[in-house]
């Protein structure tokens, strides 16, 4: 079995240099184009299944890239890290906090260890 890991296309928060986390934001114009290009990249590869988070940026990337060509599992456990009170804050603020958040959750959010556990739960 081959597994491809692909991130969502560029979101409006990515362009604004915000740490989206669990903030549900749309793709930017660039992201819409990237999603179309992603579909082209995979056009000659047969996929059995696509899995993505339930956030708009992930779902829209899949919809634009692949349409209804493949079955899709949308699952909250595949979300990015929950920065809690820092969802949507400037990326530079969040970047400076990451090392201390490996085991210790972001306020009203989660730690990196918790995120890994959540994704591990999905995979098993």
For the regions a protein language model found, what residue spans apply to each?
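Active-site neighborhood of phospho(di)ester-bond hydrolases with catalytic His/Asp-centered motifs
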Residues: 6-7, 75
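Active-site-proximal alpha-helix that buttresses catalytic centers in soluble enzyme cores
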Residues: 7-70, 110-119
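Phosphate-handling substructures
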Residues: 65-120
């Amino acid at each position: 079995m081959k597994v491809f890991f692909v991130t969502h296309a560029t979101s409006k928060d990515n362009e604004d240099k915000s740490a989206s986390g669990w903030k549900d934001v749309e793709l930017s114009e660039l992201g819409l184009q990237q999603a179309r290009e992603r579909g082209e990249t995979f056009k000659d590869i047969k996929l059995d299944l696509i899995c993505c988070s339930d956030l708009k940026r992930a779902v829209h990337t899949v919809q634009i890239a692949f349409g209804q060509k493949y079955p899709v599992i949308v699952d909250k456990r595949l979300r990015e890290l929950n920065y809690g009170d820092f969802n949507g804050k400037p990326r530079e603020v969040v970047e400076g906090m990451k090392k201390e958040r490996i085991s210790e959750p972001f306020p009203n959010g989660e730690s990196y260890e918790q995120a890994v556990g959540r994704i591990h739960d999905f995979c098993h």
